[in-house]
């Protein structure tokens, strides 16, 4: 059953204001903090301006690909509720979670069943699992049937070419949260 939504890749104040002040704002709003290849990347100076807004009922999410100490130190004072982390080991995520006292969305990029089964490794360090495609900013899809049968005791979010006009019935059986790209 879908319990929430996330809009990811917000990079301008007008869009952010619209989303936050919408009668049905998303539960999560994501900002791409260190993946410079993305057209939705937001540098620290712009992040400071964007995140000065009243976030209303939404949670702010720092989207981080293999974050290093430099970026983590730069964003630690910003009002992020969650760090969404790609390409880190469970030990690296545990260290980040403990040092920066943030809730963690562990992003697992999915190509096949082997990728799906990696979720077990992160059970002690994640607050939310995100199953995404291998495409990062390319908004590629993955076969959602790969995750239909797994049983996870934490919220499960899916991303990867999910469109606002998709039939949500397709996702209700497998996800608690839908991640829609803001790009």
List the predicted regions and their residue ranges.
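Conserved N-terminal beta1-alpha1 strand-loop-helix module at the mouth
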Residues: 1-183
């Amino acid at each position: 059953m879908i319990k929430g939504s996330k809009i990811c890749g917000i990079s301008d104040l007008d869009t952010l204001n619209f989303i936050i002040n919408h009668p049905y704002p998303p539960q999560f709003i994501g900002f791409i903090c260190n993946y410079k290849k993305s057209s939705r990347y937001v540098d620290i100076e712009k992040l400071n301006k964007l995140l000065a807004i009243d976030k209303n009922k939404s949670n702010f999410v720092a989207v981080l690909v293999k974050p290093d100490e430099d970026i983590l130190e730069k964003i630690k004072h910003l009002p992020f509720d969650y760090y969404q982390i790609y390409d880190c080991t469970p030990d690296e995520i545990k260290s980040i979670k403990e040092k920066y006292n943030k809730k963690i969305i562990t992003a697992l990029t999915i190509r096949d069943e082997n990728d799906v089964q990696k979720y077990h490794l992160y059970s002690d360090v994640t607050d939310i699992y995100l199953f995404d495609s291998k495409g990062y900013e390319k908004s590629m899809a993955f076969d959602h049937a790969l995750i239909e049968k797994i049983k996870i005791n934490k919220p499960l979010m899916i991303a990867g070419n999910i469109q606002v006009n998709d039939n949500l019935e397709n996702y209700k059986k497998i996800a608690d949260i839908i991640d829609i790209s803001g790009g």
